[in-house]
Amino acid sequence: MLRAVLQANKNGVPLHKLQAEYKSVTGEPIPFKDMGFPALDAYLKSIPSVVRIEVSRVGEVTCYAVACKETARIAELVAHQRSSKKKGGHQVNCQMRLKSTAPVSHFGKPKITLRQPGFTPPQEMMIRKPVPTPPWGKGNYFGPRTFEYSPQPIPQLFGVAPMQRHLPNMNRPERKVTLPPRFQREVKSPLLPTPITDSNANHTQSYKRVVIGSGQSDLPVIQNNLKELLNKHSNGLWLSKLPQLYKETYKQDLGGEVLKQVPSWTHICTVQKLVSSGHTEIVIYATTRKQQPSTKNIQNRSNDQAKPNVPVVLSTPSSPPPLQISGSIPKDELKEKISTILTKYSNGLWYHALPKVFEDMFKQKLPIEAFNLDSLTDICTVDLISEEPFKAILYGKSAERAVQNSNPSVNNNIPQKLHDREPPLCSEEPDMTMAPPPLVIPSEASPSVLVVELNSTNDVVIRYIGRDYSAAQERMEDELKDFCSKSSTAQVRPLRVGQLVAAKAEEDAWLRAQISAIEDKKIKVCYVDYGFSETVDITKVCKLGKPFYTLPFQATKCRLAGLEAFCDDSVIIKALEAKACGKILAVEILHKSEKPLVVLYDTSGDDDININAACLKELYDRSLSLQLKANLSFSNVTVTNVCSDGTLFCQVPSKGLAKLYETLQKVDGEFQFQQVTSHLYVSLPFCGKICLYHYKGKWARVEITNVHSSRALDVHFLDSGTIASVKVSELKEIPPPLLRDLISIPPQALKCCLADLPLNIGMWTPDAVLWLRNTVLNCPECSIKVVKIDEAMNMVHIYLFTSNNFPDLERSINRRITNEELLKQKQKDVFLNMSVSSLEKGRGGGGAPASQLFPSGPCISPTSVAKKPDMQQSSPVPSFNMPPALPLPRPGEHMDVFVSVACHPGHFVCQPWQELHKLELVMDEMRLHYSTTEEKPIALEKNKLYAAKIENNWYRVLVKGILTNGLVSVYELDHGRHELVSCRKVQPLIEKFMHLPFQAITSQLAGINCEQWSEETSIVFRNHVEKKPLVALVQTIHESTHPWERRVVAYIVDTTLPDTDIWIHELMTEYLAQFSKPE
């Protein structure tokens, strides 16, 4: 009957609603306690043939039915019974993952805390305490500091979605040792009126009572309703889910002000705060609940970050565990019992939970004299993670190595003492319940992995490469080899399936393995660090000592994004084996879970290859590809795009194009008659993903090429060759019934160039491109004649004709564009960045001579600067008010800054830290605006404001100079950088983007004077401040007419260390003193 209830819900049933659903059909709840199970989820996990349990990204547990023909009829009846009880209204979940933009790389967060004598705040002169390090700011006590960035709060309008971006090989950060969460200090959140909570501890806390407003006349009714809800959901409710559940149950909205007061109603509910990866979530329970949720369930709610598993015993603060002595316990016996407890909790035990665990296990009170850290140090390792002693973690002596493995900052070598131990001690049979700690997913942006093997794209076996992974495994295997070769009690007796052993492999290597089958004198083992199985002789098996349980199993599985629908396709599997198996690849982790969702990249060549996208292309139906040969002619051709370098994209009538139109019509029909739900929207954008975009009343296939932020991304139109920036919310998923049909059609945009014209010469002039676009893009029917096919460049050389000129070569577009009368006033500028001699060395084959393109005369140097603009277009620069000046602190005050550019101590550029999120929003708007606006030739003027496209982003710039080779020198007004860009990438800056003050603050370091800075000094200064969040203490402000000419003289302080402020001017003074000393 349970299967039938679940089958009637195609989208599954949330775990907290399952009892109600079951009872609404059968009239009675699921009797899991009568069957000997303490909780409902434990019973469901015992029947995997009936129920499949999944945990969503937000941590919600959902139950699905496992198919069974026998209950199909019952499921239909249940669905019919439930149809009358369904509540109307559907909600579309369009939440996106927050992504930070690309213009700057932020690492860490500055703290305005100056401890330098003379600048110490009054409150710190009284008492000095270590400055808490934010959970996202990881430090390294043993090496260079690293910084990570926590994005500024983004309005709810833009959704929430963490940044996921693949880093190119050259830009990938070095692997550095960082501290795990248990070494990081707590930080108070100004938004939550709760005490400090450690990031690894999920404690149940009661909030302080909040005064309720007088306008809440129906407050008793709301409180009674909440009592009913909490009693019904005995496993607790997420506070964020409460308004929706309340509205569904009582047909009333739960106001925002009431929701804020709910945690303070201690007479109704008990509050539990769960902290994971710097994010805080709140669960509320009825005050009469008998037991706290298990640690296992809490760990499952940590949805995105796999962490070292520290057991947490939850206890209500209002009833602390008793510490009275019930009887006299000998000291040796007491130590032995505590050691037994710590052995069971191999991953550590909270100090404050020891009395309760002791009483539960031995039915005795823990003597109060034993509840002392000093008396426990001889039997366990005490890890103080904060100044609060009750926040200590206790580890048994045998579990020390497990802690080292889970903490990348601790040396995780297998101890050298292993050789000195007695063989009987090391060869003791480990507890069968003992297991290695879970594998922690690397925190770096783009880690390296070795792809071991695969049977499905949803089960790809990988191994992480790095110091704390593959290198640690190699050290362990060396120790294991020495141990097994010296051990006199090597053989395992008895053998059991599932037992961990050491197995001898090729080349006398000993590897950790798990027994999967036993057959006479042969056993089948799975090498847990490599992910493959092998049958070995029983004599080649050795006991696995306890020290070798400390390193997590290195073989893990992942899922490949974008290939879920073709996970078992033989073509995909074969291509993936050829492109990935046995290779070390870079991986972009989109969703961290037990089996993370990833994108693989091959970075061994000059360009990064997206393995997921490359495998998807193997599904192309080659019969739908256009068959091209030299001298073939095609009519009814449509030119879909003209690029600035003269490259064209054409659609040629073919079988594939007809199939594409037919399939897209079916897509349109699917969207017209299908109800709009959240699964139709792209919720997880990533590079290489194929989806749909509605453009000019029609659906088009697009491939995501770059994800900028939570709102904007770049896409490539597969069938027109166009590249554009679009909003994420405008993308749709391909309907599953049509997914394979659309994926199997090769791209229908044919990349072409005009034959007999110079190739690879840079951009054409605006007039030439504009004439070509007006001539061919608006032509209803064009014709082409294939001259040559360049497979290396993926380019087709063609003669292009308009409708009435085929096949007269003299009237082709190729010849007309080189006609003297076409661009009479600007013949010398038809092509930019090109000399006459290079044209004469262009392609052969009867092309037009260079004299037809350029008049005779000397070649202009590319670097010569024009005194006046050489453009005479009619579009004027718009006139509007300048943005307001950026407010600066007064002398003697300080501000948080981000140093974007650092040349030397006499010149660097800062940005106000608190305003960076506003700048990112403006750049998002600029990207969306200019990507959808047609390029217009403008008359560029020196010292005027424009918008310029630099590396796929649009910036507010000031034109500093105009070169005759088509390049423009610009100054980025928000970042302080000088760049050279093409004149084609400069557009008018509209008033919409002038409200935010220019963010670049030109600065000079105070406290140090030098007329000329050496290159060595500049490098030292740059390494200490560039691309870092710091604190600036303003000394002097030099005002000017224009905001970009203002100059600030300030002290710069690095406050990222817990107890020490680094004053940059002192550091540079010391360096100059050392540098000036005679050798």
Swiss-Prot record:
Q: Which Gene3D superfamilies match?
A: 2.30.30.140, 2.40.50.90, LOTUS domain-like
> What is an example of a GO molecular function annotated in this UniProt entry?
mRNA binding
Where is the protein found, in the record's own terms? Cytoplasm
Q: Does the keyword Cytoplasm apply?
A: yes
BP GO annotations: lens fiber cell differentiation; lens morphogenesis in camera-type eye; P granule organization; piRNA processing; post-transcriptional regulation of gene expression; spermatogenesis
Major location (coarse)? cytoplasm
- Establish whether keyword Cytoplasm is in the entry: yes
Gene Ontology cellular component terms for the protein in this record: P granule; ribonucleoprotein granule
Annotated ranges, domain HTH OST-type: 1-69, 218-288, 330-398
Q: What family does the Swiss-Prot or TrEMBL record give for this protein? A: Belongs to the TDRD7 family.
* Protein name per Swiss-Prot or TrEMBL: Tudor domain-containing protein 7
Species name for this entry? Xenopus laevis
Q: Which gene encodes it?
A: tdrd7
